[in-house]
């Protein structure tokens, strides 16, 4: 999901 992409940071 979009939020998962931010969690990588």
UniProtKB/Swiss-Prot annotation:
This is FMRFamide-1. The keyword Repeat does not apply. One of its GO terms (cellular component) is extracellular region. Keywords: Amidation, Neuropeptide, Secreted. GO terms for biological process: neuropeptide signaling pathway. The modification Phenylalanine amide is found at residue 9. Detected in the thoracic perisympathetic organs in larvae, and the dorsal ganglionic sheath in adults (at protein level). The lineage of its organism: Eukaryota, Metazoa, Ecdysozoa, Arthropoda, Hexapoda. It comes from Lucilia cuprina. Its main location: secreted. Signal peptide: none annotated. It is found in: Secreted. Belongs to the FARP (FMRFamide related peptide) family.
């Amino acid at each position: 999901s979009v939020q998962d992409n931010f969690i990588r940071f």
